[in-house]
Structure formats: structure tokens, C-alpha cells
Amino acid sequence: MNRSFHFLIKYIYIHVLLVFYFHIKQQAIMPFFIFFFSSFDGLSFDLRVVAFLAKHVFVGVCSPFFVVGFFGSSRVVVTEWLSKLVLPPPPVSITQVFSLSRKRGEFSSGYILIINPYKSFLRSLLDFSIFNNTAKNKSSTFTLNLEDVSK
């Protein structure tokens, strides 16, 4: 089996675990859909697709929703695209959950989870940052460790 197939199996496994975690531990944060995409190449295209789906497909259907993707060394491009599309400039942290605030009904509350494939996939699952965009457009970041939450 080639390397990309192993990546695929790992990330499908992670996504299933995340769905169960949010379903059991955080019932107020129910994932509606997981969009699995690879962005090793064609990163700009992938993020355009994510933005289109978030704006035209998921909004108004179920809130919150999840869009899941991963990237490697191009985090600067990811930051630029996300800040232009739906968010203020995010923190530098690679593995993040972005919380979208309501803006005149244009976006429902939602989350974009970006997993770093170059970390251990278990570490990516257990330790990630949450980006919180408040109503006053002030940003705060904190780290959520799922090991601590599950105790």
C-alpha cells in the first residue's frame, strides 16, 4: 500500500472519532457534515470549494457544520485564503478550529477544522486550538485538550 492510502485511512479514522466525540461530549456542537479534501496541491482551489460549500450549501441547512481538511507546508497560503474568505486573520497555529460569527445572516455559526497531517494523527486529535470570533470582532485563542475533557 502506498503512503497516500495510509494517510487516507488515518484521516477517515480521525473524522469518525471527532464525530463521536462531539456527539457524546458536546451535544450542543453537532457536526452536520464532514467534507474530506486533500490540499497537498491545488490549495487555492480547495479553499474556494470550501468557501462555496460553506456559503451556498451548508448555511441555513444545519448549524453548526463542519468542514474538515488538512494541509502541509502551505499554512501561509491557508491563512491568507481563510482571512479573505470568511474570517479575520487566524492565529499562526497549524491545527485550528475556526468559529464563524453571524454577520447579518450571511453565515450561520460553524466550524472549520484543519488537521495537520505531519503531526502524529493522535496528537492532532487530542490537542488543537480553537479560534473564537466574538460579536465584538475581538479574537481569542485557547487550547482544548480532549484528554482533559474526557476525564
From Swiss-Prot:
Domain of life: Eukaryota
Keyword Membrane: yes
Keywords: Cell wall biogenesis/degradation, Glycoprotein, Membrane, Transmembrane, Transmembrane helix
GO CC, one annotated term: membrane
Residues the record marks as carrying a glycan: N2, N132, N137
Lipid bilayer topology: Multi-pass membrane protein
Location of the protein in the cell: Membrane
Keyword Transcription appears in the UniProt entry: no
GO biological processes: cell wall organization
TM ranges: 17-37, 51-71
Signal peptide: none
Functional note: May be involved in cell wall organization and biogenesis.
The protein, known as: Protein ECM12
Source organism per UniProt: Saccharomyces cerevisiae (strain ATCC 204508 / S288c) (Baker's yeast)
Taxonomic classification: Eukaryota, Fungi, Dikarya, Ascomycota, Saccharomycotina
